[in-house]
């Protein structure tokens, strides 16, 4: 019995504890990133943004959370109640489940599986079901139109994201996210005789794919300028029109969790993960989780600036960009990268 406990029960308890700790840290990070998003947008518009709740408005997101929890959920009369309430739960659960395989530093991962990137791609592809369920169950035309737009948009840009990931996998030769980060210790910089640095990361050697992945990530997470599913001027709020209180909060949490996931994946695939910008002794003292967080915040800042500066695309422009520009470009890059790797015999 004791052997059974230490062999099976204890590892399971450790994994549950790690998952709960990751969940708490992730929710706190999302709360402050949401505040940062609002602050950036306010600064661009020459406003102050949230500045009342707590010093510099730091507790605004927590006040909003409390407000949503204390509100009574209202279910439309013609809605399918079970599906209506299940939809936000599906959306937020799938969004949070992807973080199980994200390595925030060397060894800082809940489940270090060999097919981590495939797991993330599979789970994130299912997130559209939560949006479709919410749009259909609301029994209203605006949510349904928003859900249909979201399904078409996410499916269109998943193709480009998948091909971008294939180019990275060709260079690394592994589906393990930790291996993808460690492979970026050598690259174009070390080939030129320079010490390991940011010049070795994939953002330089795969720069077109870096741009495609970033823009496709915006479309995949319904962020401006690709926020067609919840366009306020057209569909009021898209699939979330009929939602309020806790279900609305869960949809928003799932949306921002997906945005943070794109920041994490961009950091891992193209920005060296937890690796320092230059491999020197005083930068190696900085914990890897700090480098990872700084790079992720930089990507999130770029996403926030895009929201503030770039106007919304029309639906036909969105589809044309995905199918007529990104898809051929991604396919061409897969062929070019494979040809170069075969010709040179180099990977890394």
UniProtKB/Swiss-Prot annotation:
NDH-1 is composed of 14 different subunits. Subunits NuoA, H, J, K, L, M, N constitute the membrane sector of the complex. It comes from Agrobacterium fabrum (strain C58 / ATCC 33970) (Agrobacterium tumefaciens (strain C58)). It is a multi-pass membrane protein. Keywords: Cell inner membrane, Cell membrane, Membrane, NAD, Quinone, Translocase, Transmembrane, Transmembrane helix, Ubiquinone. NDH-1 shuttles electrons from NADH, via FMN and iron-sulfur (Fe-S) centers, to quinones in the respiratory chain. The immediate electron acceptor for the enzyme in this species is believed to be ubiquinone. Couples the redox reaction to proton translocation (for every two electrons transferred, four hydrogen ions are translocated across the cytoplasmic membrane), and thus conserves the redox energy in a proton gradient. This subunit may bind ubiquinone. The keyword Protein transport does not apply. This is NADH-quinone oxidoreductase subunit H. The keyword Plastid does not apply. The gene is nuoH. It comes from the Bacteria. It catalyses: a quinone + NADH + 5 H(+)(in) = a quinol + NAD(+) + 4 H(+)(out). It is found in: Cell inner membrane. GO terms for molecular function: NADH dehydrogenase activity; oxidoreductase activity, acting on NAD(P)H, quinone or similar compound as acceptor; quinone binding.
